[in-house]
Amino acid sequence: MQQQSNIRNFAIIAHIDHGKSTLADRLIEYCNALEAREMCQQVLDSMDIEKERGITIKAQTVRLVYKADDGCVYHLNLMDTPGHVDFAYEVSRSLAACESSLLVVDASQGVEAQTLANLYQAVDNNHKILIVLNKIDLPAANPQQVQQQIEDVIGIDASDALMISAKIGLGIKDVLQAIVTKLPSPNGDSQSQLKALLIDSWYDSYLGVVILVRVVDGKIEKGMRIRMCSNNAVYTVENVGFFSPKKQISGVLYTGEIGFVTAAIKQVADCRVGDTITDDKKPCAQILPGFKPNLPVVFCGLYPSDASQFNHLKDSLQKLRLNDASFEFEQESSGALGFGFRCGFLGLLHLEIIQERLEREFDLDMITTAPSVMYKVYLNTGKVIDVHNPADLPEMQKIKSMSEPWVEATIFIPDQYLGAILGLCTEKRGVQVDLTYVNGRAKLVYLLPLNEIVFDFYDKLKSYSKGYASFDWQMNSYKQSDLIKLSILVNGNPVDALSTIVHRSKAEFRGRELCKRLKDLIPAHLFQIAIQAAIGSRIIARETIRALRKDVLAKCYGGDITRKRKLLEKQKAGKKRMRNIGNVEIPQSAFIAALKITNKD
């Protein structure tokens, strides 16, 4: 049993690509947690998608054993967290399990938007902050200027910030020494009843549901009967251990420690992230506060390409939700696509990652509908309803008004790109709140409609600023807007999967653009196909796919013109009849094209 005073629990937080995972690699390497042949880049990024994209998606934990200069052996529980705003929920769960944070800042880039967002979360959790300036070996690094920037922008003392280069291993011992001397040990009563926080869970085909816990009071050991406080489900603990980063069976976890527990849990719904776990025989008197779940902000429909795969998709979504608590889904049906699920995500990257994981890990082939956000619809009757699926929107004459979600966006950019970014924000219906300058960089605060930023705002921001802009946002409020439903009709029949809710000023552009895309993607038939964009009963854009022509005169070598005319009239009548009864098959690529429409001038 390790003394509680010799345990340190800390999270590594930073903006995207400031070196969190590389620093975690160096700490693991220095503590000899893995042999040299087992080390690789981003060793804690276990998913293929993480390695390919070079980003952290899942927060990971590892226990390191470090012998300090004072001769004592310390157990360091490190949690590597994602930097992207779409995975902020992973960060909040990691912070709830720790007492302190390493704030990593790139010495060449300085303070970025997500640096601030993650730091404020850590401060809200009463964390002790240790500032680490990374990449000081780069020619563009300016540690003194970044220290000043941290003090000016964030308002915390950076005079004793640690100077390191995680890539070449410079200053790693200083970081470890600072962790054991400056960061606090966990609080908690080792003699009290068991009280543990459920941080994460995932599904294992052999072990059932595996849960990751932080023991706040007491201890959890093999053979113990544990109870989930949210639903009173009781299980017998089969195995207890920790990650080093390989899985190690210890048989017991004491106060302040972080590790995994298996208990033959088969019900996915029994494990709710943020739940309190206690001893079934001697339950704790008060449950832990947990943490507030992030509400999804982007919604889309997921449908199996083959209807027989519906149950497989349902099982896959349930297993994935166990591993990603910020993702939500509910069953729905569509006239064009059949049975599927309406899913909620924290952003467009989150949507992309979930879709890719479903395809890779569960071998699913799916159709994804256009993303939308949650709107508040005020009816003439006085009732207020939430709508995130355009197909559920009532008729326009029944609607008094509609409100859409607005966000407060914080953007950091070098001065020379300010004009282009101000133009982009104005184009997206933004309202400027604040503009300040710090050491040659501008900090912009804008209010923007969420519907405008979920599609292509981030891509355009990076393009306009040559990749130098950083961006973070948080929900602000709902505001009344002139919103309408844009319907797409193919051959006179509405396709509900392609309908969207848009601002009236953008409706004509989006309708025309979508009709053009569909004209290129829907194959020609033996009859003419009309593709129309409509607002209510008014058509605002139209494209026509010409009919394939069968040459009925091929066998007529000369002869009377009336014979040819008779054959052409017969073909014309047949095409007219076919247009009335024929079905148009819309390929999957047409639905995917709806995602890629950008507001180009």
Curated annotation (Swiss-Prot):
GO MF terms, alphabetically ordered: GTP binding; GTPase activity; guanosine tetraphosphate binding; ribosome binding; translation elongation factor activity
Catalytic activity: GTP + H2O = GDP + phosphate + H(+)
Enzyme class: hydrolase
Gene3D superfamilies: 3.30.70.240, Elongation factor 4, C-terminal domain, Elongation Factor G (Translational Gtpase), domain 3, P-loop containing nucleotide triphosphate hydrolases, Translation factors
Biological process, per Gene Ontology: positive regulation of translation
Keyword Protein biosynthesis (UniProt): yes
Cellular localization per UniProt: Cell inner membrane
Keyword Ribonucleoprotein in record: no
Sequence ranges assigned to domain tr-type G in this UniProt record: 5-187
SUPFAM superfamilies assigned: EF-G C-terminal domain-like, P-loop containing nucleoside triphosphate hydrolases, Translation proteins
Signal peptide (from-to): none
Record GO cellular component, one term: plasma membrane
Binding site for GTP: 17-22, 134-137
Stored NCBIfam families: lepA, small_GTP
UniProt function note: Required for accurate and efficient protein synthesis under certain stress conditions. May act as a fidelity factor of the translation reaction, by catalyzing a one-codon backward translocation of tRNAs on improperly translocated ribosomes. Back-translocation proceeds from a post-translocation (POST) complex to a pre-translocation (PRE) complex, thus giving elongation factor G a second chance to translocate the tRNAs correctly. Binds to ribosomes in a GTP-dependent manner.
Family statement drawn from the similarity comment of this UniProt entry: Belongs to the TRAFAC class translation factor GTPase superfamily. Classic translation factor GTPase family. LepA subfamily.
Stated name of the protein: Elongation factor 4
Lineage of origin: Bacteria, Pseudomonadati, Pseudomonadota, Alphaproteobacteria, Rickettsiales
